[in-house]
Swiss-Prot record:
All residue ranges annotated as the ABC transporter domain in the record: 1-259
Keywords from the named record: ATP-binding, Cell inner membrane, Cell membrane, Membrane, Nucleotide-binding, Peptide transport, Protein transport, Transport
Name assigned to this protein: Peptide transport system ATP-binding protein SapD
PANTHER family for the chain: OLIGOPEPTIDE TRANSPORT ATP-BINDING PROTEIN APPD, PUTRESCINE EXPORT SYSTEM ATP-BINDING PROTEIN SAPD
The family this protein is said to belong to: Belongs to the ABC transporter superfamily.
Compartments, as annotated in UniProt: Cell inner membrane
Pfam families per UniProt: ABC_tran, oligo_HPY
Amino acid sequence: MALLDICNLNIEIQTSNGRIKIVDGVNLSLNEGEISGLVGESGSGKSLIAKVICNAIKENWIITADRFRFHDVELLKLSPNKRRKLVGKEISMIFQNPLSCLDPSRKIGKQLIQNIPNWTFKNKWWKWFGWKKRRAIELLHRVGIKDHRDIMASYPNELTEGEGQKVMIAMAVANQPRLLIADEPTNALESTTALQVFRLLSSMNQNQGTTILLTSNDIKSISEWCDQISVLYCGQNTESAPTEILIESPHHPYTQALINAVPDFTQPLGFKTKLGTLEGTAPILEQMPIGCRLGPRCPFAQKKCMEKPRRLKIKQHEFSCHYPINLREKNFKEKTTATPFILNCKGNE
């Protein structure tokens, strides 16, 4: 069952020069109890989508969607107050740069205790006194911090990046959310610390059944932990599929470029071996290409790519491309004409 179901999400930002469309018709579906990945380079709209889900919306954002459901509740149709209450209870987010999200003038212990909501107390009334401190210690132990006394007595600037990230995870799970969004949780972390964070999130998914959405610009690093991956480019869906299928046989050129950009160290590389890169640069927000936004950089682009590609589906594999790769032309035509693979966002309402 889909815990989060988003169809045709558009995010525009009102500026002095008019509206700029950042996210263009994105679909996203998260099944309950799974770890899903949202992959794309900087500027693809990953963080914007995550903030919209968490209701961290600015006044100059214009948000529309055919469907924006969380557990069968249409979030965009709720009043701001009801949406804030629902999201605050059911969804948590771990932001980038954890140390910058903490109050530098207050100790970690006080911030963590203040972040624990009263409704999570489910014990006898006489155990109320001091329960938040006990709960804070329990949360720190759960995220792998054994020496809780030093951490709780420290200020944010006295923590390492890894400790700061673990503290942010402890704060995020204090309200026992059904959905946890981790916005590039291993950004700027050492490889060993990043591995600890991924293992921690994975154990939370397995032990507590928490649904997790990971955003990243490194498709290989999160492919080891995610059940499903969706790829974005400049605010548009390119491809979505179960992780193993997506990595082994991507149908969109951009997904293939992301995979090729990661060096394969299983075999020795030759002297001055060039890394796999996609030619060109991402367009600026004010000058997005019409149609497929990858068109100017795509090695397979043709005139038809000036039209926005339809979103097609073959079994569990969804992609938006006029000229998909890793598909035999004959089989592709047979599959796409035999059944209606064009996704209809309004069909399930």
